[in-house]
């Protein structure tokens, strides 16, 4: 059972996660930058920790600083919210390595889905229906035209990289 969640986000996103946690009886930990020191999510959380300057790269994207807060606060799970670290497979892997539950997809899933061609290949292998399209990267206009003719009326767009 998760007892304490660090929400690695701010504003309305953090507040929404906190509301759900409180409904479930889970303690919440907020992180904040210089810009958010007086924000509602900081005041609403059970615990709040300063993580750096206003620039996201120096605060909300600072994986080591957030890990430090997770470990020192006794957090057993992290909710990344939306944006920031929510799609960062390296951060999800860092959480796994430190035995902290990452509330979201696994690092491997994020890594796979970050590459459209690998993701589509995995979906096809698992018999998941996909939209019609190329089987891989389209190298030239002739190949694009051939694929477009095969797709027919379902064609939305094919982009040929130079």
Where in the sequence are the language-model features?
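Gly/Ser/Thr-rich active-site cleft segment
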Residues: 150, 154-162
């Amino acid at each position: 059972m998760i007892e304490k969640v660090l929400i690695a986000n701010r504003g309305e996103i953090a507040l929404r996660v906190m509301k759900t946690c409180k409904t479930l009886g889970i303690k919440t930990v907020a992180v904040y930058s210089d810009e958010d020191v007086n924000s509602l999510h900081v005041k609403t959380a059970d615990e709040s920790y300063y993580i750096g300057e206003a620039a996201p790269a120096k605060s909300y994207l600072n994986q080591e600083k957030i890990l430090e807060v997770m470990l020192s606060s006794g957090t057993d799970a992290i909710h990344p919210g939306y944006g920031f670290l929510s799609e960062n497979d390296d951060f999800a892997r860092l959480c796994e390595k430190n035995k902290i539950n990452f509330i979201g997809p696994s690092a491997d899933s994020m890594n796979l889905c970050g590459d459209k061609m690998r993701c589509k290949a995995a979906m096809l292998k698992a018999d998941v229906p996909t939209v019609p399209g190329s089987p891989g990267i389209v190298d030239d206009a002739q190949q694009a035209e051939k694929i477009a003719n095969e797709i027919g009326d379902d064609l939305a767009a094919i982009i040929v990289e130079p």
